[in-house]
UniProtKB/Swiss-Prot annotation:
Domain notes: Contains three distinct domains: an N-terminal catalytic domain that contains a binuclear Zn(2+) cluster, a central dimerization domain and a C-terminal sterol carrier protein type 2 (SCP-2)-like fold domain.
Name listed for the protein in its UniProt record: Linear primary-alkylsulfatase
Organism: Pseudomonas sp
Sites where the protein binds Zn(2+) 2: 196-197, 322, 367
Industrial or biotech use: The thermal stability and higher specific activities make it an ideal candidate for the application in the biodegradation of SDS-containing waste water under elevated temperature conditions.
Cofactor: Zn(2+)
Length: 674
């Protein structure tokens, strides 16, 4: 999965004082507002309409709900439940409390405010605790968004993907140790570069042991770069949208958050990162780790930019990372991310079949529950291989017939054999938005119709639409008729124009909220449900300026290379304000023996490595450690200069002037209103 952003989010006015460097991890930032968000959650949530009940009932007839195989698999190997006590931080802050989802009870029928297929998926996800996958392989499930896997070797244990937070990872390891021998951790494997697969590493190993060679950390090529950089440039936007995607502002109940389809939600603890010691660079690499033979398959650009699958030969066990789970995954994440390639994804699954399909006996992933049996594993890999390929090929076939993105998304239906398998349902991704993403991957956002080439911005467009439709009252009156017919998609689309034309029109916002809410109740995708219901909540209640604490991760900051850091600064430069200004600074990092020139000119900030400008306004000498301390607000530029940690020759005011031109971003920007 998916959110490891850095941002400069602030809460409050857009004109708040400049904060030099403030970073946050988007998973963590979104999760950190869970508890405070509950206090204003949707007491105005409405019941399901007859149209919604009918839509959800129809799905009960379409899918084989009498097939309980998934429940048998999810219970298989159960050893112990999660402890009843929630995980809290040192200050009493809530980090993880799966008991909030106790209302999702196995065996109970879906409430009419929930899609029955998503309800079923949430029931399965809530089957939690410590499980044996096969002899010597164990998983802790539902102690975070992802699973933590533990493999017993000759001298110790190897941990796969230590969750999001240090606290949840430690609790997962403690649970394992209560029921298994307390062998030392001798290796960690990061399957890919999303934070829910590495953020808790300091909860299971000590970095001193890594540096001493007692613990090895394996990761795919490009892991560190992508773990830090994937979402840096759009961190605040991604984080805000993540609060919608994971439903962090919603109450967990039958009219609110059910989970995310991939897991329940994200933990809100301490995100950490220890750089890998061993890099997997290509398919076919074999490593003996603690007496077991690991065969690796490099799969970049599948579910993550840096990802790998691997097979433990002695166990005949395939770790599918996040490329084959019990859901149609995202080829585009609704929080915002670069689009993933479904064709490449399909080919990786085909390669896994080629490499290990004859021998594999169990497949487990870093979300959900395992699949046992050679025939069953091959079937899941084959069907999901064909699912992603079908999305790719059918999107392009229809595009080449002249259909547009939206038209294709309405037309494409998966073959029945694929679509009726619960593991291929769109609980996290969705067929609709994955098709749209595939179109954009190949053809971009423009559909070819020149009428859509230079559209008006939403508010300007909305005012004209409302005027031409006879005014807001006329639109709302007609929209109510469509609402009563159950045409919620159209109501949401047309009333959105009224909301953007007249943002203070509460009647319009209430009708829009009602329509979005019913769409949420019908949604099979967890993120779709969360987006719809969070949008409805903010339309009714407004955007609540909740605290967004500084969740800076020292490990992430230290892992940023200077090139990325300077790009990040350049993104924050208020270009229009400095278009006619010119500043040149030389930077000398004495510990790294690296020199840079920064030049602010024409409204941009360029940096050049290995160069010192002859006529620079000033030369700044410092160490990377000092830069880290300033970034983490452990010191200030002024204090660092006073202590001699930063030396400035030339115009000492130019560095401060440059930093005064950096923008800060309000986390709580509007989404469903202008």
């Amino acid at each position: 999965m998916k959110l490891n952003a850095l941002s400069t989010a602030t809460h409050g006015s857009r004109s708040s004082p400049v904060k030099l460097w403030k970073f946050s991890t988007s998973f963590l930032l979104a999760a950190s507002i869970i508890v405070s968000g509950q206090s204003w959650a949707a007491e105005t949530a409405k019941p399901a309409t007859d149209a919604t009940k009918a839509a959800n009932d129809a799905l009960l007839k379409e899918l084989p709900f009498d097939d309980k195989t998934s429940f048998d698999l999810a219970h298989k190997g159960f050893i112990a439940p999660l402890p009843a006590e929630p995980i809290k931080g040192e200050k009493g802050n809530m980090i993880w409390d799966p008991s909030k989802y106790g209302f999702i009870k196995e065996g109970e029928a879906a409430p009419d405010t929930t899609n029955p297929s998503l309800w079923r998926q949430s029931q399965l996800i809530n089957i939690s605790g410590l499980f044996e996958v096969t002899d010597g392989i164990y998983q802790v499930r539902n102690y975070d968004l992802s699973n933590m896997t533990i493999v017993e070797g000759k001298d110790g244990i190897t941990i796969f993907d230590p969750l999001i937070s240090q606290e949840t990872a430690k609790a997962a390891l403690d649970l394992y140790y209560k029921h298994r021998p307390k062998k030392p951790v001798v290796a960690v494997i990061y399957t890919h570069s999303h934070v829910d697969h590495y953020g808790g590493v300091r909860g299971v190993v000590d970095e001193a042991d890594v540096k001493a060679g007692k613990v090895k950390i394996y990761a795919p090529l490009g892991f560190l770069e992508h773990a830090v950089a994937e979402n840096v440039m759009a961190g605040t936007a991604m984080s805000r949208r993540a609060s919608y995607m994971y439903g962090n502002l919603l109450p967990p109940d039958a009219k609110g958050q059910l989970g995310a389809g991939l897991g329940t939600t994200t933990s809100a603890g301490t995100v950490t990162l220890i750089p890998p010691t061993d890099i997997i660079k290509e398919t076919g690499e074999t490593h003996v780790i603690d007496g077991l033979t690991y065969e690796f398959m490099y799969a970049p650009g599948s579910e993550a930019p840096a990802e790998m699958l691997y097979y433990i030969k002695e166990k005949k066990a395939l770790n599918a990372a996040e490329d084959s789970t019990h859901t149609l995954h995202n080829t585009y994440s609704l929080r915002g991310a670069k689009i993933r390639d479904p064709l490449a994804w399909s080919k990786y699954l085909n390669e896994a079949l080629k490499l290990w399909g004859d021998d594999v006996q169990v497949m487990y992933a870093m979300h959900h529950w395992p699949v046992w049996g050679n025939k069953e594993v091959r079937e899941q890999l084959s069907l999901q291989r064909d699912m992603y390929r079908y999305i790719n090929d059918e999107t392009l076939r229809l595009a080449n017939k002249g259909y547009t993105m939206t038209e294709i998304a309405e037309q494409v239906k998966l073959p029945k054999k694929i679509a009726t398998k619960f593991s291929n349902r769109g609980y996290y991704g969705s067929l609709n938005h994955n098709v749209k993403a595939t179109y954009v991957l190949y053809l971009g956002w423009f559909i070819g119709n020149p009428a859509t080439l230079w559209e008006l911005p939403p508010a300007d467009k909305a005012k004209r639409y409302v005027e031409m439709m006879g005014g807001a009252d006329a639109v709302l009156k007609k929209a109510k008729e469509y609402y009563d017919k159950g045409d919620f998609r159209w109501v949401a689309e047309v009333v959105n124009h009224v909301v953007f034309a007249e943002p203070n029109n509460q009647a319009a916002k209430n009708m829009q909220a009602d329509a979005l809410e019913q769409l949420g109740y019908q949604a099979e995708s967890g993120p779709w449900r969360n987006f719809y219901l969070t949008g409805a909540q903010e339309l009714r209640n407004g955007v609540q300026q909740l605290p967004t604490p500084d969740t800076a991760s020292p490990d992430t900051v230290k892992a940023m290379d200077l090139d990325l850091f300077f790009d990040f600064l350049a993104m924050r430069l208020k270009g229009p304000d400095v278009a006619d200004k010119h500043i040149t600074l030389n930077l000398d990092f004495t510990d790294l023996k690296q020199k840079y020139t920064l030049e602010m000119v024409n409204g941009v900030l360029n940096h050049t490595e290995g160069m010192q400008a002859k006529n620079a306004d000033a030369t700044v000498t410092l160490t990377r450690e000092t830069l880290n301390n300033v970034m983490l607000k452990q010191t200030t530029l002024k204090d660092a200069e006073s202590s001699g940690d930063i030396k400035i020759e030339g115009d000492k005011g130019k560095l401060e002037e440059l930093m005064s031109y950096m923008d800060n971003f309000d986390f709580w920007f509007n989404i469903v209103t202008p």
